[in-house]
A protein has these predicted regions:
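Hydrophobic packing positions in regular secondary-structure scaffolds
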Residues: 1-268
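A short hydrophobic/aromatic micro-motif that marks alpha-helical segments and, especially, helix-coil
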Residues: 63, 87, 99, 111, ...
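Extended alpha-helical regions
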Residues: 157-160, 172, 433, 438-443
């Protein structure tokens, strides 16, 4: 049997676990010493809290800040709790403003106060600017570290100015052009700067189309869509007065896309994407029990409707055997539509303008699948129980449930979005209740009428 080739991360984790299990803490600290902060963060998320407490003090203070911005919130809270106020300040004071803005809300007040005292006035103002916007908006996502020039200078002057700076912000692919009041006018691409003549004026080379600004209040989901559509590396951010307030870079957008993907998966079962995989048992139990309670309520709703047909079930035991088939088929069909529509809304591909067309299409798909699978299930039922009426009843119930499931799966995300409720979080449990109830009522109701 061929051996499975391990990834670099799996090898690093395996070696780290061996050292920790052998209580060889010095070796464990040495193994992660030369790793990138992102790799260290991933390893810390993959080990138990007690092992993190051993490893964390061995990581250089200058690296700890970079690691803190990469780990999820649960792990971040634990690591912050392991640090003194002085160490927290030293670890975070050199971070980019946007990264610092993400961490500050999770720091103790004493650490925040000390940190603000270490920042110069300009840095402090930039941090306050970002914190004034919602965390999930373009303003909360942006970095205030960018380069601006005036439109009435030459390329030669711009290049001279950049040389005086000696260092450019990370992911700088364009320089922003502003007037004296800091109103955004456009951008000057670095490629243009390097290829045009030195006496060319900036205003004649300003690019207004490729770098349309993003409003600071724009939701981060829409920001991610704009970056995808325009193939952006960075984008300017403006306020309601068209004044340049920051820029968003591709690394921030990658984080948004990753977080949204994790949220979509985790929220479907009531979990938080920032939950620590190795969180204490009672903490994890407390978080999950709420969702289990909600599921229990919906289960009893379905049981109530089944109870209405108790006499019918007593007359024919085969109904009880086949009930899960009807509910399961509707649940799967509805979930398929729910995910398609929820994802479409998140990416901006589904709106009120085209939802009617999509609902019609999903109902048609479920109708076709309903016909195909009702025939298959009807034949299996007839072969199993030799009962023609029972076969017809389950076939009709399957078609009914699949049609209702498709309509519900398409309509629910829209309705929940209108109510400001995350469809990825609440849609699944509501849909399951609908398909279970409709499936059971259709199947048992038809059975009561015809059998």
């Amino acid at each position: 049997m061929a051996e499975v080739e391990l990834t670099n991360f799996e090898v690093s984790l395996q070696n780290l676990m061996i050292s920790l299990e052998a209580s060889n803490h010095d070796e464990a600290k040495y193994q992660i010493k030369e790793l990138h902060p992102g790799e260290i963060a991933r390893l810390l998320e993959a080990i138990q809290p007690k092992d993190r407490a051993v490893i964390w003090p061995g990581i250089e203070i200058s690296i700890q800040g970079e690691v803190l911005k990469e780990v999820n919130e649960d792990v971040q809270s634990q690591l912050i709790g392991e640090m003194s106020v002085d160490d927290l300040v030293k670890a975070t004071e050199k971070l980019d403003t946007d990264d610092l803005a993400d961490i500050v809300p999770n720091l103790p007040e004493s650490a925040v106060h000390s940190l603000l005292l270490t920042l110069d006035f300009k840095h402090r103002e930039r941090l306050n600017k970002i914190l004034s916007y919602p965390e999930d908006s373009a303003g909360g996502l942006m970095n205030t570290d960018f380069i601006t020039v005036r439109p009435d200078v030459t390329i030669r002057a711009v290049i001279r100015y950049l040389r005086l700076l000696k260092e450019m912000p990370v992911d700088t692919d364009q320089i922003f052009v502003v007037d004296r009041d800091f109103n955004y006018l456009g951008s000057l691409l670095i490629t243009t700067l390097l290829t045009e003549g030195p006496e060319q004026m900036v205003d004649s080379l300003t690019n207004n189309e490729a770098s349309k600004p993003i409003n600071a209040d724009t939701d981060e989901s829409e920001v991610a869509i704009l970056f995808e559509q325009r193939n952006l590396i960075s984008a300017p951010v403006i306020d309601e007065n068209n004044q340049l307030v920051g820029r968003i870079t591709i690394d921030d957008v990658v984080d948004v896309i990753r977080d949204q993907a994790e949220h979509s998966v985790m929220s479907m079962v009531g979990l938080d994407e920032d939950e620590d995989v190795f969180a204490p048992i009672f903490q994890s139990s407390k978080r999950r029990s709420v969702w289990l309670g909600v599921n229990l309520i919906t289960a009893f709703i379905a049981v109530y409707f089944i109870g209405l047909f108790e006499a019918t079930l007593q007359q024919k035991i085969a109904l009880a055997i086949l009930m899960p088939v009807v509910a399961s088929m509707g649940g799967i069909a509805g979930t398929q539509t729910l995910i398609i529509v929820t994802r479409g809304i998140a990416t901006g591909r589904v709106t009120s303008a085209n939802i009617k067309t999509l609902i019609n299409k999903e109902v048609a798909v479920s109708g076709l699948n309903g016909i195909i699978w009702s025939i298959v299930i009807g034949l299996i039922t007839y072969y199993w129980f030799s009962d023609l009426l029972l076969s017809l009843v389950i076939a009709l119930a399957i078609i009914t449930n699949l049609l209702v499931a498709a309509f519900s799966g398409a309509f629910l995300p829209l309705a929940l979005t209108k109510l400001k409720i995350d469809p990825a979080l609440a849609g699944g449990v509501i849909l399951t209740t609908i398909t279970d109830v409709i499936g059971f009522v259709a199947f048992l109701g038809l059975a009561a009428l015809f059998i």
